[in-house]
Swiss-Prot record:
Organism: Ipomoea purpurea
Protein's name according to its UniProt entry: NAD(P)H-quinone oxidoreductase subunit K, chloroplastic
Main localization of the protein described in the UniProt heading: plastid
Record-listed [4Fe-4S] cluster binding positions: 43-44, 108, 139
GO biological process, one term: aerobic respiration
Location in or out of the cell: Plastid, Chloroplast thylakoid membrane
Length: 235
């Protein structure tokens, strides 16, 4: 069953008995029907769109893309995440029902990519916002790599215990790395923070040559002017 082995029942026996636990049954049902919420913001998402075609056929994994976070149990982030997007992404993750999983796809999502050095508005890794289960590096990763990431996530689901996962999330509520976010009043006003913008001096504030000379003359004391006048008069 897609690289995940389960004991098969003997269909020839009439009185077959299934011996399992509620946790194993729950894991089997969840890994066979992952419903992803597609959060694509950049070019990496184009590679995931290739899985929809008949060549890769991601329907065989039980993947059904959803447009509502309340109906999804997997969020796949692909592309750059900016500071302005961060609250929306966290809100989408919190609206997903438990248990929920995250796949970080691409270098820009995992580390910030080429925007991680000079950009002041890029989040250096989506794991600073939401907990990530599977990291998928690449720029962009191939569709085969995405299938491998989904397979690894299904293996993780098949072995986990739901109670342990909930305890781990309560103890380590995200974030092993300290981020440097600045709390603002609102991000949906449409106005930029003026402190980050360099304001060029206006033309009215640039003094002309006449104003400079006049300012210099005003700065000279009257005593100096009298002395200079007397000096020129003697000559």
């Amino acid at each position: 069953m897609n690289s995940i082995q389960f004991p098969l029942l003997d269909r020839t026996a009439k009185n077959s008995v299934i011996s399992t636990t509620l946790n194993d049954l729950s894991n089997w049902s969840r890994l066979s029907s992952l419903w992803p919420l597609l959060y694509g913001t950049s070019c990496c998402f184009i590679e995931f769109a290739s899985l929809i075609g008949s060549r890769f056929d991601f329907d065989r994994y039980g993947l059904v893309p959803r447009s509502s976070p309340r109906q999804a149990d997997l969020i796949l982030t692909a592309g750059t995440v900016t500071m302005k997007m961060a609250p929306s992404l966290v809100r989408l993750y919190e609206q997903m029902p438990e248990p929920k999983y995250v796949i970080a796809m691409g270098a820009c999502t995992i580390t910030g990519g080429m925007f991680s050095t000079d950009s002041y508005s890029t989040v250096r890794g989506v794991d600073k916002l939401i907990p990530v289960d599977v990291y998928l590096p690449g720029c962009p990763p191939k569709p085969e790599a995405i299938i491998d990431a989904i397979t690894k996530l299904r293996k993780k689901i098949s072995r986990e215990i739901y109670q342990d996962r909930m305890k781990s999330q309560r103890a380590n509520r995200c974030f092993t790395t300290n981020h440097k976010f600045r709390v603002g009043h609102s991000i949906h006003t449409g106005n930029y923070d003026q402190r980050f913008l360099s304001q060029p001096p206006s033309t009215s504030s640039i003094p002309t040559e006449t104003e400079t000379l006049f300012t210099y003359k005003n700065s000279v004391s009257s005593h100096e002017l009298v002395n200079s006048a007397g000096f020129f008069g003697t000559k």
